[in-house]
């Protein structure tokens, strides 16, 4: 169990009745009289802890190894490190981040089947032994650069119903798997298990069943070749928000029987997974400011009366876009929905609108068409469920900086964090509803709080 590290955040415990939305509104109010209305995030670390409790309940046999690539914010990684999760790292830099927070190498899997030789050597020097492969060339690289590695064979799956398909690029077929196991034996490289990934944003839970069945076949092949394999990695693909068609428990209700059938609890096989968006998607809300506006008139045929026959539409330009947080639209096939920071009047008219990012690229469009009341320069829009594959891949194209992140946590979750820090993760903790609970806020960058509203504390996160 990792304790909290030396990377410190000032934390403020708010009085009862304050919520994450209050923190967001407070920040907006603080900058309302300023010209610097930069985009920013509010991220609920308590939501991440609740996700972990939910995981333990829904998949009790499966140890999560958080996919750092999904969101590599230090506060996120540190919070998960404190809960005892493992970490799926894809590069030297991610390994450095995780180990820099005190995570031991046995809680890391280098889950990239195609690695640079220098980074394989770095993994060896840092004590990271578990790593994936799916080709003979990778086997030979590892044999030379890290002969003591504990290899996990990545197999291909049917990910045709996933939002982001991965098996086109990664994974060995069942036929190739036997050849690779035989080659690993010749090279005297230890293969300890099998991994797969059904694709990010999986929409068919039955895909997991077939993949687990295929993994069983490869385990049997390993036994025939002479390996004693003991690790099954079921990858990711778990939803991270409640606006998806397929719910988390719908997936786990299919996975658990498959695991019990093909890898029963007395089989001696350790089971891990690589959830990313599951942990962080719903924890992040992004606030963006309207920096420019354009009115467009769409002429209707058969009339010369502009006021009555022409349709008015609006183009809004905000201070984050597809080169920043909304890269998820291009790379993660995300569909985002703009929410209003101010509640519209009941009789307010709505107009066809589009939302654009701040860069000079015409591709920088966030929402092609939506209905909004007329808004103005200086108004704010909110986007929920923005924690997955957003900040990690954001660039500073055109000189636009990444948004600051402000962290919040409910008092019960804060108290749980303190217990973890002192005594480790308590297995008997139940999920808690934070709907009306007091909130606390940790800052990653420069947010002041009114002293009357909160008590100051310090947490090593």
Swiss-Prot record:
Signal peptide: none annotated. It is an enzyme of class 4 (lyase). It comes from the Eukaryota. Inhibited by antizymes (AZs) OAZ1, OAZ2 and OAZ3 in response to polyamine levels. AZs inhibit the assembly of the functional homodimer by binding to ODC monomers. Additionally, OAZ1 targets ODC monomers for ubiquitin-independent proteolytic destruction by the 26S proteasome. One of its GO terms (molecular function) is ornithine decarboxylase activity. Its EC number is 4.1.1.17. Substrate binds at residues 331-332, 361. The keyword Phosphoprotein applies. Disulfide bonds: none annotated. Coiled coil: none annotated. The modification S-nitrosocysteine is found at residue 360. Pathway: Amine and polyamine biosynthesis; putrescine biosynthesis via L-ornithine pathway; putrescine from L-ornithine: step 1/1. It catalyses: L-ornithine + H(+) = putrescine + CO2. One of its GO terms (biological process) is regulation of protein catabolic process. The active site is at 360 (proton donor). Its cofactor is pyridoxal 5'-phosphate. Pyridoxal 5'-phosphate binds at residues 200, 237, 274-277, 389. The record marks 197 as: Stacks against the aromatic ring of pyridoxal phosphate and stabilizes reaction intermediates. One of its GO terms (cellular component) is cytoplasm. The modification N6-(pyridoxal phosphate)lysine is found at residue 69. Pfam families: Orn_Arg_deC_N, Orn_DAP_Arg_deC. Homodimer. Only the dimer is catalytically active, as the active sites are constructed of residues from both monomers. Belongs to the Orn/Lys/Arg decarboxylase class-II family. Catalyzes the first and rate-limiting step of polyamine biosynthesis that converts ornithine into putrescine, which is the precursor for the polyamines, spermidine and spermine. Polyamines are essential for cell proliferation and are implicated in cellular processes, ranging from DNA replication to apoptosis. This is Ornithine decarboxylase. It comes from Mus pahari.
């Amino acid at each position: 169990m990792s304790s909290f590290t030396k990377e410190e955040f000032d934390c403020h415990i708010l009085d009862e009745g304050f919520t994450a939305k209050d923190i967001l509104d407070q920040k907006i109010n603080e900058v309302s009289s300023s010209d610097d209305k930069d985009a920013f995030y509010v991220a609920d670390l308590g939501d991440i802890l609740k996700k972990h409790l939910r995981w333990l309940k829904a998949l009790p046999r499966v140890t999560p190894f958080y996919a750092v690539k999904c969101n590599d914010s230090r506060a996120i990684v540190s919070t998960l490190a404190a809960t005892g999760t493992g970490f799926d790292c894809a590069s030297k830099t991610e390994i450095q981040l995780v180990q820099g927070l005190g995570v031991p190498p046995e809680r890391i899997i280098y889950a990239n089947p195609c690695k640079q030789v220098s980074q394989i050597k770095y993994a060896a020097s840092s004590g990271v032994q578990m790593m994936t492969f799916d080709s003979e060339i990778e086997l030979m690289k590892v044999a030379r650069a890290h002969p003591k590695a504990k290899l996990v064979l990545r197999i291909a799956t049917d990910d045709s119903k996933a939002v982001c398909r991965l098996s086109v690029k990664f994974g060995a077929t069942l036929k190739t798997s036997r050849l690779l196991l035989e080659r690993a034996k010749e090279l005297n490289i230890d293969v300890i298990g099998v991994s797969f990934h059904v694709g990010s944003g999986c929409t068919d839970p039955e895909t997991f069943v077939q993949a687990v069945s295929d993994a069983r076949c490869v385990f049997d092949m390993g036994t025939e070749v002479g390996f004693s394999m003991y690790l099954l990695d079921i990858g990711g693909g778990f939803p991270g928000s409640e606006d998806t068609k397929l719910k988390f428990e719908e997936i786990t209700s299919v996975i658990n029987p498959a695991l019990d059938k093909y890898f029963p609890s007395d089989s001696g096989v350790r089971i891990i997974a690589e959830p990313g968006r599951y942990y962080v998607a719903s924890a992040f809300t992004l606030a963006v400011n309207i920096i420019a506006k354009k009115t467009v008139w769409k002429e209707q045929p058969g009339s010369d009366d502009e006021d009555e026959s022409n349709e008015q539409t609006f183009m809004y330009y905000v201070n984050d876009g597809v080169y920043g947080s909304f890269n998820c639209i291009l790379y993660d096939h995300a569909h985002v929905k703009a929410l209003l920071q101010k509640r519209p009047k009941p009789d307010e008219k709505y107009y066809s609108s589009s939302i654009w990012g701040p860069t000079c690229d015409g591709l920088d469009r966030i929402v092609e068409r939506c209905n909004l009341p007329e808004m103005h320069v200086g108004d704010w829009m909110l986007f929920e469920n923005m924690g997955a594959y957003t900040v990690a891949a954001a660039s500073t194209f055109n000189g636009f900086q990444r948004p600051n992140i402000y962290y919040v946590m409910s008092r019960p979750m804060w108290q749980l964090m303190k217990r973890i820090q002192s005594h480790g993760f308590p297995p008997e903790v139940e999920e808690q509803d934070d709907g009306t609970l007091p909130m606390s806020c940790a800052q990653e960058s420069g947010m002041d709080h009114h002293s009357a509203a909160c008590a100051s504390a310090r947490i090593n996160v």
